[in-house]
């Protein structure tokens, strides 16, 4: 039997489905100097790689929020649960035995010496076989990519997920398929020819070498298994789950009244960090608008909480429990205080991927949330209010659509 010349292996990891739709454009504030200047570092690549692999191994889709939700920054802010998770998992990636190679390899040459193999041979003789064995066993791996040549440049190294490979034994060329969170939504390859000491990435980078990182999976937070297509139109008669853009939590209500001073005692409305049927709202048209009418910037709707049958409501002069802004509650009977005007970025039709405000028609206050909670007054969940001004905490997007 002739020797097989071209050898391939791959795992069913798809960067489009299992990666994130926004780039690794995070800026981390490490220190604030006495003069107010901020010391920053760039990126959370290891956290994004670890979290993406967490979702894949759990058999769950990664959250598919798009970069334009957080324009102009293009990434979830630090108030968002996903951004905080990236930070936690980035730290996890550094507190592994293999992470020391980011430092040691950055201080070694590409070529072998009397004592050490060097980065080229370490990669091709030790780490590449580990990648191949893992992929052949059906398991993607986190790779540490090394470009630095001194300690001062260690921060330029990178972390990705390897999920496929191809080896041409005749030419000596090896290609590794990776999810690179600097290039969202597309496959990236690392290629090295037989006599080549480094690895050329299809997205323009050149890496000295790579190693397999130690990784322990963590159960991911799953808010939906049925994310809509971002282009799906939203209409009256639809049932939605709405996600708060700046924190990632879900608009929620439960059969429990407000009890704080000055309240009207109606049903609490909060933002919830999990996912259940108490997050589902029916969009109902006003003024005889028929079900199935496409909604757009300027449309007015009412939101009926499906679990309790009550209506999203607000009223002037009633304080919210924690911030003292205008209270948002759910009431038995709808009237003009249950009317909400839709404001869509760029005055477009309302689609599932759009960033929208819901503005209370009677008071012109925007549906709003922020990271304030109380175990008694909001059941430990995030306060939802109607805010008379406008800021980033007023934005919402569709998490589920049915």
Language model: regions and residue ranges:
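Boundary/junction segments of secreted and surface-exposed precursor proteins
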Residues: 1-24, 231-239, 243
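Cysteine-nucleophile protease catalytic domains, especially the papain-like/related folds used
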Residues: 8-125
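Short linear interaction motifs
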Residues: 25-32, 36, 123-127, 136-146, ...
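Active-site-proximal structural scaffolding
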Residues: 38, 124, 136, 155-158, ...
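Active-site-adjacent substructure of cysteine-protease-like catalytic cores
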Residues: 120-176
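Cys-His-centered catalytic/binding microenvironment captured across papain-like cysteine peptidases
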Residues: 153-157, 166-231
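Lectin-like carbohydrate-binding module/patch detector with strong preference for beta-trefoil
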Residues: 227-402
């Amino acid at each position: 039997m002739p020797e097989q010349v071209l050898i391939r292996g791959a795992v069913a990891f798809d960067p489009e489905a299992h990666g994130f739709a926004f780039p690794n454009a995070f800026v981390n504030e490490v220190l604030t100097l006495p003069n107010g200047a901020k010391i920053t570092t760039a990126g959370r690549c290891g956290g994004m790689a670890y979290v993406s692999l967490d979702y894949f191994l759990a058999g769950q889709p990664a959250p598919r929020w798009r970069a334009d939700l957080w324009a102009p920054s293009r990434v979830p802010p630090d108030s968002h649960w996903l951004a905080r998770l990236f930070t936690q998992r980035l730290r996890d990636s550094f507190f592994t035995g293999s992470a020391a190679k980011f430092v040691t390899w950055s201080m070694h040459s590409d070529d072998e010496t009397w004592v050490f193999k060097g980065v080229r041979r370490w990669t091709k003789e030790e780490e590449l076989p580990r990648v191949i064995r893992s992929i052949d066993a059906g398991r993607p791996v986190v790779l540490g990519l090394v470009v630095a040549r001194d300690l001062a440049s260690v921060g330029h190294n990178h972390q990705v997920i390897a999920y496929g490979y191809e080896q041409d034994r005749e030419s000596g060329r090896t290609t590794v398929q990776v999810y690179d969170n600097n290039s969202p939504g597309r496959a990236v390859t690392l290629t090295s020819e037989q006599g080549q000491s480094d690895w050329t990435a299809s997205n323009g980078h050149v890496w000295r070498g790579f190693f397999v990182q130690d990784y322990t999976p963590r159960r991911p937070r799953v808010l939906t298994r049925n994310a809509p297509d971002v282009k799906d139109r939203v209409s009256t008669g639809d049932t939605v789950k709405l996600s708060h853009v700046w924190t990632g939590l879900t608009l929620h209500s439960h059969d429990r009244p407000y009890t704080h001073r000055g309240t009207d005692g109606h049903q609490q409305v909060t933002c919830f960090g999990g996912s259940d049927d108490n997050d589902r709202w029916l969009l109902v048209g006003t003024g005889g608008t028929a079900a199935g009418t496409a909604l757009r910037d300027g449309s007015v709707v009412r939101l009926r909480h499906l679990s309790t049958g009550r209506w999203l409501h607000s009223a002037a002069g009633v304080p919210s429990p924690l911030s003292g802004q205008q209270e948002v509650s759910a009431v038995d009977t709808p009237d003009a205080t249950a009317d909400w005007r839709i404001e869509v970025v760029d005055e477009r039709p309302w689609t599932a991927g759009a960033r929208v405000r819901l503005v209370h028609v009677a008071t012109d206050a925007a549906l709003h949330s922020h990271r304030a909670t109380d175990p008694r007054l909001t059941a430990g969940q995030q306060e939802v209010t109607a805010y008379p001004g406008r800021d980033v905490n007023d934005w919402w997007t569709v998490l589920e659509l049915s």
